């Protein structure tokens, strides 16, 4: 009966790849730092993503039969209060991600339909800019929620399609980069030298604080691995396939980012391409890929007109690829986090109707409540008077910090997990408690360090207090809400402090 519901290893790899690897992070990173982004990706990969992936591997193998995902991991490693706050914080960061993507996903849609970002020109029934994007985002979230309630089969299928197209997009970038490099006599468009790897052509990222704060963008590029943790019990042969899928994905993603950023420089001169016109974080990916098509046309001897046509085709294809990739990730994020929140945390925290599972084994009521929350946030943000560009930028900034703080909960929990010898650990990548604790501390420090720099950078460099407040307010608000919910649960069920974990019982 359950065989049809199980997820194979390669499907799981594609789901992880879709959830973690963001193709747009490649041109965005090159836009912010040039080749200087590569060392930060290497540092973040070595000190954060790879050890973090190994931690998730050990967690997943040890708790392969648990349905609660990261809540179960943290609850059994540290305690219920710590686990609830970490899970709730992580869940709310995914709400922010959904709000951001529900509006920003229309940029790749525009590139697919029109060959360039024309979202600022869109107008319908008197609505334009962030207002129109907000309305479209609301329609999208409702549609995806409806389809997702029909079962995991639909989710895994759409997520896999997204992963396939992201893979094709990366192959296109790599092969295209080689063609341009060879066609130009092995002379990269952006000169390669030692200085290029330790500095940034972007004046906003030339200071120590600016360069260090870029680390949070690298960390964000590696984010999302824990989303699939809720699918351990849905995996085919989880004790073997889940850890293998995580390790394989971690290697592909880490190496892939660094190579891809290098290849962007083969066909993109930073000063010539990324300083002309209205280049921003939302559209830079399509500008870069449009340029790739144009440069390929040039080295192959196309006429200027045909080279431009090829560039537009590349922009359209990347638009389609990113549209499908983001849609695939959306389907995973719209289900897995709410599943872990509802099935992992104590049922009595939530109203009884929220925990009901439909015939497709989906928490339908909770998913529609989640949909309503996202719709309300989108509406409030869209009609707040900000331009589309600022609207997207603020949401991206807000998501960076909110998304990475929960990683600290998991890395701290891993230290406790390694210490508890009675927990059966089928896979031990970190062979001893000491090595696990050291890497747990390193990962926690790296995340905290990057977030602090990101938070203070707007004040120090631009005197922009609003950006700082925005990045700090979200996480604080969600922690307060989490504490209130847990306190209500504890009071209602007359739990005493002895049942709380020692780490957070004093909060």
Q: Model-found features: residue ranges?
A:
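C-terminal membrane-solvent junction of multi-pass transporters and transport-like membrane proteins
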Residues: 2-6, 357-360, 404-456
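Extracellular loop-to-transmembrane helix junctions
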Residues: 25-133, 469-479
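Helix-loop-helix junctions that connect adjacent transmembrane segments
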Residues: 38-39, 121-125, 129-131, 160-307
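Loop-to-transmembrane helix boundary motifs in multi-pass membrane proteins
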Residues: 4-12, 134, 236-238, 248-253, ...
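Membrane-interface "cap" regions at the ends of multi-pass membrane proteins
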Residues: 1-39, 43, 49-57, 65, ...
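TM-loop-TM module centered on a large, flexible mid-protein loop between adjacent transmembrane helices
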Residues: 72, 251-330, 351-391
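Membrane-interface loop-to-helix entry segments
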Residues: 134-190, 223, 246-251, 396-409, ...
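Transmembrane alpha-helical segments of multi-pass small-molecule transport proteins
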Residues: 11-16, 114-152, 170-176, 370-373, ...
């Amino acid at each position: 009966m359950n065989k049809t519901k199980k997820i194979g290893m390669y499907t799981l790899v594609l789901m992880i790849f879709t959830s973690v690897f963001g193709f747009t992070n490649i041109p965005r990173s090159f836009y912010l730092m040039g080749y200087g982004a590569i060392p930060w990706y290497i540092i973040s990969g070595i000190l954060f993503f790879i050890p973090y992936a190994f931690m998730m591997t050990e967690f997943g193998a040890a708790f392969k039969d648990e349905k609660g995902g990261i809540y179960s991991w943290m609850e059994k490693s540290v305690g219920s209060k710590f686990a609830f706050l970490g899970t709730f914080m992580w869940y709310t960061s995914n709400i922010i991600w959904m709000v951001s993507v529900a509006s920003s996903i229309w940029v790749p849609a525009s590139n697919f339909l029109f060959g360039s970002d024309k979202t600022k020109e869109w107008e319908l029934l008197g609505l334009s800019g962030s207002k129109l994007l907000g309305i479209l985002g609301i329609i999208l979230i409702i549609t995806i929620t409806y389809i997702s309630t029909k079962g995991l089969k639909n989710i895994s299928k759409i997520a896999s399609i997204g992963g396939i197209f992201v893979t094709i997009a990366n192959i296109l970038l790599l092969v295209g980069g080689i063609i341009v490099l060879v066609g130009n006599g092995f002379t990269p468009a952006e000169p390669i030298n030692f200085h290029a790897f330790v500095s940034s052509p972007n004046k906003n990222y030339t200071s120590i604080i600016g360069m260090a704060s870029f680390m949070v963008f690298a960390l964000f590029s590696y984010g999302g691995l824990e989303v699939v943790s809720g699918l351990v019990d849905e995996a085919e042969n989880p004790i073997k396939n889940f850890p293998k899928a995580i390790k394989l994905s971690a290697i592909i993603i880490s190496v892939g980012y660094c190579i891809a950023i290098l290849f962007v420089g083969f066909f993109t001169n930073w000063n010539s391409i990324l300083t002309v016109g209205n280049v921003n974080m939302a559209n830079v990916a399509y500008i870069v890929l449009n340029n790739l098509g144009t440069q390929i046309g040039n080295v192959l001897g196309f006429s200027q007109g045909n080279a431009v046509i090829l560039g537009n085709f590349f922009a359209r294809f990347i638009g389609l690829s990113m549209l499908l990739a983001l849609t695939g990730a959306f389907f995973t994020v719209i289900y897995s986090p709410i599943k872990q929140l509802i099935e992992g945390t104590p049922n009595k925290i939530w109203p009884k109707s929220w925990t009901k599972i439909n015939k497709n084994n989906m928490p339908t009521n909770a998913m529609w409540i989640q949909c309503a929350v996202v719709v309300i946030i989108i509406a409030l943000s869209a009609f707040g008077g900000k331009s589309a560009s600022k609207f997207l930028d603020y949401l991206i900034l807000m998501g960076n910090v909110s998304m990475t703080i929960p990683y600290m909960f998991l890395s701290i929990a891993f230290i406790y997990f390694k210490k508890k010898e009675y927990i059966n650990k089928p896979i031990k990548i970190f062979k001893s408690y000491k090595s696990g604790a050291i890497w747990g501390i390193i990962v926690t420090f790296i995340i905290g360090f990057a977030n602090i720099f990101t938070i203070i950078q707007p004040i120090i460099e631009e005197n922009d207090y609003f950006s700082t407040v925005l990045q700090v307010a979200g996480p604080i608000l969600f922690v307060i809400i989490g504490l209130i919910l847990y306190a209500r649960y504890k009071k209602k069920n007359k739990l005493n402090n002895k049942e709380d974990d020692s780490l957070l019982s004093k909060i």
